[in-house]
C-alpha cells in the first residue's frame, strides 16, 4: 500500500453508517501522485499527496 513520502499519509479505514445505524467497512484513500523529486541531490520517483504538492513541501524535477 502506497503512502506519502513526506507526511506518511496513507489509507484510513472505518465504517459507513446508514440512518438505521447499519454499518459496513469502507476506506478513505489519500490523493497520492507519483512524482520525481530530488532526494539527496538525485532524482527519485516517490508517492506524494496532492496536498503536499500544493503546499510546496516538495518541488518536482
Swiss-Prot record:
Gene3D superfamilies associated with the record: Ribosomal protein L28/L24 (2.30.170.40)
One Pfam entry name: Ribosomal_L28
Signal peptide boundaries: none
GO molecular function: structural constituent of ribosome
Gene Ontology terms describing biological process: translation
Domain of life: Bacteria
Matching InterPro entries: Bacterial_rp_bL28 (IPR050096), Ribosomal_bL28 (IPR026569), Ribosomal_bL28/bL31-like_sf (IPR034704), Ribosomal_bL28_bact-type (IPR001383), Ribosomal_bL28_sf (IPR037147)
Region (Disordered) residue spans: 1-26
Gene Ontology terms: cellular component: ribonucleoprotein complex; ribosome
Keywords for the protein's UniProt record, in alphabetical order: Ribonucleoprotein, Ribosomal protein
Family indicated by similarity: Belongs to the bacterial ribosomal protein bL28 family.
HAMAP family, per database record: Ribosomal_bL28
Name listed for the protein in its UniProt record: Large ribosomal subunit protein bL28
Species per Swiss-Prot/TrEMBL record: Lactiplantibacillus plantarum (strain ATCC BAA-793 / NCIMB 8826 / WCFS1) (Lactobacillus plantarum)
UniProt gene name: rpmB
Amino acid at each position: 500500500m502506497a503512502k506519502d513520502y513526506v507526511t506518511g499519509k496513507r489509507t484510513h479505514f472505518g465504517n459507513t453508517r446508514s440512518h438505521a445505524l447499519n454499518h459496513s467497512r469502507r476506506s478513505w484513500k489519500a490523493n497520492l501522485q507519483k512524482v520525481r523529486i530530488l532526494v539527496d541531490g538525485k532524482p527519485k520517483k516517490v508517492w506524494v499527496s496532492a496536498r503536499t504538492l500544493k503546499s510546496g513541501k516538495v518541488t518536482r524535477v
